[in-house]
Regions:
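Substrate/ligand-engaging "lid" and interaction regions
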Residues: 44, 56-93
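Residue-level detector of flexible, active-site-proximal loop/helix-junction positions
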Residues: 24, 52, 98
Length: 166
């Protein structure tokens, strides 16, 4: 879904806007940009460096596309109809992509994306190994760690032993 025919007034409402100015920039230009972009009703407005942008985008966007593309290649994907619901839809939404565009984006950010793929491979191996060994305690610990990591990443982690939200 791209191009003018899919445009709508609220397309960016509530979404983050990240500006990556040159190393030396005029704060007045940033203020001008915030004002010029305000009709789009972005949910947040951030300023960052190119290096940090590329690192975070490798994780938040590009990795999701790689994982989705890899996941859908399972032979089981061709047999899913009638069995799948929200989880399948969530994980495969971005698998149908523009290969030309994403190849270029991935190659331009290969170092960051390769690092993130390595993290996922390591974690998947931990799950596979726990399952192969029949190690229920390890599997439970891995799942709990993932749940905690999600809450921490979203800024809503609470640990009663520590007395509140972290």
């Amino acid at each position: 879904y791209s191009g003018y025919r899919h445009a709508r007034a609220d397309l960016y409402a509530g979404q983050p806007m990240v500006l990556v100015p040159p190393e030396i920039y005029d704060p007045d230009i940033i203020l001008w940009a915030e004002e010029a972009l305000s009709p789009a009703a972005f949910g947040s407005f951030s300023i960052t460096t190119a290096a940090k942008h590329d690192q975070i985008i490798a994780y938040t966007s590009q990795l999701a596309h790689v994982v989705s593309s890899a996941f859908i290649k399972s032979p089981t994907a061709q047999k899913h109809r009638g069995f799948s619901a929200g989880s399948y839809k969530d994980l495969t939404r971005v698998a149908e992509l523009n290969a030309d565009m994403w190849t270029e984006l991935f190659m331009d950010n290969a170092d960051n994306l390769t690092e993130e793929i390595g993290v996922v491979i390591t974690e998947l191996e931990r799950y596979r190994d726990a399952l192969s060994r029949g190690d229920e305690a390890e599997l439970h610990a891995l799942l709990e760690q993932g749940s905690i990591a999600k809450r921490k990443a979203d800024g809503r982690y609470s640990d009663a032993r520590e007395g509140g939200v972290r």
